[in-house]
Curated annotation (Swiss-Prot):
The gene is glyA. HAMAP family: SHMT (MF_00051). This is Serine hydroxymethyltransferase. It is an enzyme of class 2 (transferase). GO terms for cellular component: cytosol. It comes from the Bacteria. Homodimer. One of its GO terms (biological process) is glycine biosynthetic process from serine. GO terms for molecular function: glycine hydroxymethyltransferase activity; pyridoxal phosphate binding. It is found in: Cytoplasm. CDD domains: SHMT (cd00378).
């Protein structure tokens, strides 16, 4: 029998200390990594519940284990809410991550060796869209499209040419570092000309899609995948959505279980369900609108200060800054900003002369700071401080001054009040 008085602090002081330190870091540092956000206390409560104890292989009312009546309720709520939230006919809430959601789609619709067309990793795509180190690049004939060098936007002419030349079995639209609106309908039409499946990975913009701040691909693509964190602001996990197609739905379910996963994480699925309910609120609509406004404010400041923002701005929650002209590396900028308690990630940019371990750019995103309550004025100040540092990376006094300002701003806007 477990004694509830045996808290983490008593049982494992090392882990308790690390978690405590991370809590302090999250409160004291400004988080600008585009794929990160803060979940609500309700989401964390669900994820920390006794549901972690329950094995439930299969799907609601079709389990291979007994005692699933209550987790069936939880998973069905998550499924129903996801379908309503995104206007989907089908939803699978079991993927442990966005990458596993993507892997399941590949397993469901393709066979090894099939040709796929996805966005190049160095131009803003994701590892699972055909990058060489990924299963998607190793097991399939992966062809990559990129950006127009002049505009920094997707090169749709190149997409069309590659489709005609390679006749892919599946086209992947979506990104991990792209700041403009993707023309989902164009991808649908070009996929139809090749008789290809269209898969959209909307992991980065799912929250914006929910509230209409970014166009929805769900009714356009054959299958849409997403993570449940990032802009969606739920727990870390994956989600597969689709329009009605019984054959594809069966393949997707089988690809997740028993294809690539065993028992679902019922505590995480409960947390997903909670976050989906939160995303139906009026407050959530206000939040997503502010996410985009804040990103645009920050991008404009960087442009005004003479830095190269890829594509010249943003239509979503993120933007890329290229420091090729300044001969700075993303790694150095990342480190300098981190010293000022501002967290970003170095990122490859178009025509980057540096390796992916060094890069010439950074990716900046506003979901987390907007959750804290940052408004346009806060984000304008923050962008100015960042530009000050980027203009003089070796100025330790400048970094110290910015760190003090960051500390004051974080006290003004706590993550958890």
């Amino acid at each position: 029998m477990f004694n509830k008085s045996q808290t983490l602090a008593k049982v494992d002081i090392e882990i308790h200390q690390a978690i405590t330190q991370e809590k302090v870091r999250q409160e004291a540092h400004i988080e600008l990594i585009a794929s990160e956000n803060y979940t609500s206390p309700a989401v964390m409560e669900a994820q920390g519940s006794q549901l972690t104890n329950k094995y439930a292989e299969g799907y609601p009312r079709k389990r291979y284990y007994g005692g699933c009546e209550y987790v069936d309720t939880v998973e069905q709520l998550a499924i129903d809410r996801a379908k309503v939230l995104f206007g989907a006919d089908y939803a699978n809430v079991q993927p442990h991550s966005g990458s596993q959601a993507n892997a399941a789609v590949f397993q469901a619709l393709l066979v090894p060796g099939d040709t796929i067309l996805g966005m190049s990793l160095v131009h803003g795509g994701h590892l699972t869209h055909g990058a060489a180190p990924s299963f998607s690049g190793k097991n399939f004939n992966a062809i990559q499209y990129g950006l127009n060098e002049k505009t920094g936007e997707i090169n749709y002419e190149q997409v069309e040419a590659l489709v005609k030349k390679h006749k892919p079995k599946m086209i992947i639209a979506g990104f991990s570092a792209y700041s403009r609106v993707v023309d989902w309908q164009y991808f649908r039409e070009i996929a139809d000309t090749a008789g290809a499946y269209l898969m959209v990975d909307m992991a980065h913009v799912a929250g914006l899609v929910v509230t209409g701040e970014y166009p929805s691909p769900v009714a356009i693509a054959d299958v849409t995948t997403t993570t449940t964190h990032k802009t969606l602001r739920g727990p870390r996990g994956g989600l597969i959505l689709a329009k009605a197609n019984e054959a594809i739905e069966k393949k997707l379910n089988s690809a997740i279980f028993p294809g690539i996963q065993g028992g679902p994480l019922m505590h995480v699925i409960a947390a997903k369900a909670v976050s989906f309910k939160e995303a139906m609120s009026d407050e959530y609509k206000v939040y997503q609108k502010q996410v985009k406004i804040n990103a645009q404010v920050m991008a404009n400041i960087f442009i005004e200060r003479g830095f190269d923002v890829v594509s010249g701005g943003t239509d979503d929650h993120l933007f890329l800054v290229s420091f090729i002209d300044q001969r700075l590396t993303g790694k150095a900028v990342d480190a300098a900003l981190d010293s000022a308690y501002i967290t970003v990630n170095m990122n490859v940019v178009p025509n980057d002369p540096q390796s992916p371990f060094v890069t010439s750019g950074i990716r900046v995103g506003t979901p987390a700071v907007t959750t804290r309550g940052f408004n346009e004025a806060d984000c304008a100040d923050l962008a100015m401080w960042m530009c000050d540092i980027c203009a003089d990376l070796e100025n330790e006094a400048m970094i110290d001054q910015v760190r003090e300002k960051v500390t004051s701003l974080c006290v003004k806007h706590p993550v958890y009040n």
